């Protein structure tokens, strides 16, 4: 019986190390595209427009990782390559101090979900309609409509 104790301890240590290795492997995986719900997608967009940490107060970054995570394939290149835009489309201004943000699912139509977003930016009311799709990796933005324009047309107009 005494001979089994060291062997059992070795087996347990190996088991724990394997579990830890699996866990560490999943934790080190790159960020996947998409989000779990349309509301989560919208919340994560506006998390980049706060007054807090530097990485989350400069607006949604225009890089390929952000583009892959937030946008469908049709918008990814346009978003990542857009530099020097006249204003930030998501806040409809060049600067921001956002009030409370509300979002409501307007309708679900085929593969698209329309999410109405309303907030104030520097005291001015802003309304946008996010058109989001549930892709293989989660929810991503297919387009965003303002009363005067759409994100897709805005990026095409200001292509570098």
Regions found by a protein language model. Give the residues of each.
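Bacterial N-terminal signal peptides
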Residues: 14-27
């Amino acid at each position: 019986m005494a001979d089994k104790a060291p062997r059992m301890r070795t087996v347990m240590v190996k088991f724990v190390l394997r579990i830890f290795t699996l866990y560490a492997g999943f934790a080190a995986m790159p960020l996947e595209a998409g989000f779990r719900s349309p509301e989560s997608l919208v919340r994560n967009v506006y998390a980049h427009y706060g007054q807090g940490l530097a990485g989350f107060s400069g607006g949604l970054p225009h890089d390929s990782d952000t583009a892959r995570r937030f946008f469908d394939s049709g918008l990814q290149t346009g978003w990542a390559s857009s530099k020097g835009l006249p204003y930030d489309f998501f806040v409809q201004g060049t600067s921001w101090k956002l009030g409370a943000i509300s979002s409501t699912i307007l309708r679900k139509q085929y593969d698209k979900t329309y999410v109405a977003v309303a907030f104030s930016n520097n005291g001015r009311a802003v309304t946008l309609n996010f058109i989001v799709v549930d892709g293989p990796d989660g929810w991503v933005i297919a387009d965003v409509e303002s009363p005067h324009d759409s994100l897709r047309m805005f990026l095409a107009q200001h292509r570098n």
